[in-house]
Amino acid sequence: MLSHPQHTGPSPALPTPPAAGADSRVFRDVVELGRVLREDLAEVAGTGRLPARAALLVDWDSRWAVLRDSLPSSLLDVHDEALGWYRAFLEAGVRVDVLPTDADREGYGLVVAPLLHVLPGATARRLTGYAEGGGHLVATYFSGIVDENDHVHLGGYPGPLRDLLGLRIEEFAPLREGERVALDDGSSGTLWSDRITVTAPETEVWARYADGPLAGGAALTHRPLPGGGSAAYVSTRLDGEHRTALLGRLLAGAGIGSELPEDLRGRVELAVRAGAEYHFLANRTGEPVKLHHLPGTPLSGTTEEGEDARVLAPRGVSVWRVPPRDPAG
């Protein structure tokens, strides 16, 4: 018989068990949610999600493949890398759609494809066509290593993305746990680094390694493409604030801005439903957030504070009806 592990410290805070019945916080919260959906948000029913202008590709084949013990690093984690980029989008106040690698990319101005270790030829061709057609693609370290049959791509890395990115990886230089590498733009990275040879004259080196055996070598690259698109490569796992700063530069190049006022970016997450257009605002912080001069009408989730402000509670969610945007704008 399995025994339960013994806790040596304070008991963790756990959700109320279902058997607690109607006299419990969870039950009351669920009842209140039902009331809000029925009374306050009935008009939202039937609306569709409005796609974002940026996409984040998450590949489950790569997720499982990098868990093997025969790779250069045991610290690789597709989920963590993707989550880091998702957080960067939240900090920038920009909506992003999380998609599988075979999803349609039409309508997306920027596509981030982190740690695509498994890169079938068909996926590589779609990514190349997307960037050459005017889209802005971001690839990261240890991508394009094997195909869908786990056969190594010959000719150098990152496999079929070499020509698009305008570079070749000479050597992998994984970092030990806790080890850091500095870049000459003031940023730093962990987990991984590459020795890169730039092969296309138009490929720009945005940052170089500032210390260690790779000092002076390219770390962040960006290749403008004739069709107006671009292909960027990130060869290390950037720290949070530095990843957010890089993403801001990439978003600006793709012509994508935030739909949130500047004071809400990083604090409030936005989701948008089409139709009359509804904005769902989720407070990511443990503090109340003031919503000043937002367009539209609040339907739920806020309290008034003065004539021109409403307050969104800590971890709270508010829904607003806003005028439909001009499709041409």
Residue ranges of predicted features:
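Carbohydrate-binding surfaces of carbohydrate-active enzymes
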Residues: 1-329
